[in-house]
Amino acid sequence: MHKLLKLLSITLIGLSVATGVQANVRAEMNQMKTVAATLTNAKDVAEFQESAKILREIAQQSSEKRPSSITNDADFKGYQEGMKEFITALDEADKLAQEGNLDAAKTAAKKLFDIRNVYHKKYK
């Protein structure tokens, strides 16, 4: 039951993003933080993959929006590169999950937090 509720909440977050709700970058980053945590706590491959799918959608949308803390094009390009790096790392973790290696996928997903920390120092 707990697993079902968790998946439903993740799905609702994803649907709100996918349906075009106009969220600012800060709200999207908070969503990313919540969903990223579900990756490292996933109980099975299906839960991991659902979270990865939603996180990828949020990250992709966020990469197209300029945060208010970024005031020039060069920094915005750097921010977008960081988001691209984040998405690439997410895809690598998801690939491990697709191969049935949940533990390796969860370990790889921890890299997302490192990437976040590096780019938050630069652009937050």
Swiss-Prot record:
Keywords for this protein: Signal
GO biological process, one term: electron transport chain
Pfam families: Cytochrom_B562
SUPFAM superfamilies: Cytochromes
InterPro entries in the record: Cyt_b562, Cyt_c/b562
Signal peptide: 1-23
Recorded GO CC terms: periplasmic space
GO MF term list: electron transfer activity; heme binding; iron ion binding
Keyword DNA-binding: no
Keyword Signal attributed: yes
Family: Belongs to the cytochrome b562 family.
The protein, known as: Uncharacterized protein PM0670
Source species: Pasteurella multocida (strain Pm70)
